Design a protein with these regions (language model features):
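Extended, low-complexity cationic-aromatic segments
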Residues: 1-21, 49, 115
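An anionic, glycine-rich sequence signature occurring as long contiguous blocks
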Residues: 10, 24-60, 108-219, 314, ...
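Conserved nucleotidyltransferase catalytic core and NTase-mimicking acidic/glycine-rich helix/loop elements
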Residues: 258-294
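Domain-level cores of phosphate- or acyl-group-handling catalytic modules
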Residues: 48-125
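Short, solvent-exposed helix-loop connector elements
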Residues: 95, 199, 207-214, 229-246
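Short, hydrophobic/amphipathic alpha-helical patches that form generic packing surfaces
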Residues: 20, 248-261
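Structural motif
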Residues: 8-14, 238-249
């Protein structure tokens, strides 16, 4: 427990913060790495560490450093790589973005409005550094397009976007960053641009697909509400390292089971239910306790075979097909840092 920024509250508070790596697509998401962040006040306090049973090998690391380690571990475990999505608290960190590039991955990283970039010029002259907010305000009207990226619960989701090729301005001592895309959102009913992303994805990616990727974080935010409130991920009140991760592991396992069941068991309704063939009783079925005209001797008394124990004709839910690439769109689940 430490007084620090709490994303759920949007302000400073006494709380515990975890760095999470999830895999996600439009249908579901699932955390695959979950680690408690320990600030300096904890890592440098030996009595406090001992009381909370913090392993001696744990040293202070920033949240971006923990996130990068989680991505490396996922790749080492042969998790299918996808585009890395980050909110602004991670995406603004140039070291994390560069580390992702060195791993051979692409990212779509939300950034804050004060991040400096150099717009790419056709004459190859080196432009001055400018904040992404100032760059957005200076774009001509024809640079903006209204993009619809998906169907919402009540209406199509759309907003106004622009994209510009830029170089992220390096900090002192950093090498020049490669050319990438700055994506900007400026809803028509807002006085100024509201959101910014840096993306090193293929320049040939369609405008809509780029917006769709940037907006995929809604899946994580939506699922985290269920994880924290319905499953109880946010209910832990203990003070030990092991207890925190034990509670998180069980909560995530329970959530993984639930999203598997949602795929296996369709919602109630005549349209979906009619598609499910009801299992038929096997030939020769006899209710338990009914007289058997051909009673068996004691060694063969129980004639029920294990194959009759379950008559469900469903796929094994352990493979979680909702997180595999669909046939309609062969796209891997993306990495999302939370």
């Amino acid at each position: 427990m430490h007084h620090q920024y709490c994303g759920q509250l949007g302000k400073q508070a006494n709380c515990q913060v975890a760095v999470t790596l999830s895999i996600a697509n439009h249908h579901a998401s699932l955390p695959i790495a979950y680690q408690l962040y320990l600030p300096h006040a904890w890592t440098d306090d030996k009595p406090r560490r001992a009381k909370a049973y913090v392993p001696s090998a744990i040293r202070f690391k920033t949240k971006p450093q923990i996130a990068l380690e989680q991505i490396r571990a996922a790749l080492k475990a042969s998790v299918a790589p996808g585009v890395v999505l980050m909110d602004a608290s991670y995406g603004t960190n140039s070291g994390l973005r560069q580390g992702i590039v060195e791993l051979g991955l692409c990212y779509v990283a939300a950034i804050i409005s004060t991040v400096k970039v150099r717009p790419v010029r056709e004459d190859n002259r080196k432009p001055r550094r400018i904040s992404v907010a100032a760059l957005a305000l200076g774009l001509p009207q024809h640079a903006w397009r209204t993009i619809t990226w998906r169907e919402g619960s009540n209406a199509k989701l759309q907003s106004r976007f622009a994209r510009v090729r830029v170089h992220a301005a390096p900090m002192r001592g950093e090498a020049q960053f490669a050319e990438e895309t700055l994506l900007i959102e400026w809803p028509k009913d807002e006085a100024t641009p509201t959101k910014f992303w840096l993306a090193n994805v293929d320049d040939n990616m369609s405008f809509r697909d780029l917006v769709d990727l940037a907006k995929l974080r809604w899946r994580i935010e939506r699922d985290y509400q269920d994880l924290k409130q319905e499953i109880g991920l946010g209910h832990y009140e203990g003070r030990s390292w092991r207890g925190f991760h034990h509670h998180g592991t069980l909560s995530i396992a329970a959530y993984g089971f639930l999203i598997s069941e949602r795929e296996r068991i369709p919602p109630s309704g005549p349209d979906r239910a009619a598609q499910i063939e009801k299992p038929a009783l096997p030939s020769g079925y006899r209710p338990r306790g009914a007289p058997d005209p051909a009673a068996a001797s004691h060694p063969q008394f129980d004639r029920h075979h294990t194959s009759l124990a379950s008559r469900c004709d469903c796929d094994d839910p352990s493979t979680m097909p909702m997180l595999r690439p669909s046939r309609a769109a062969e796209q891997a689940a993306e990495f999302v840092i939370q």
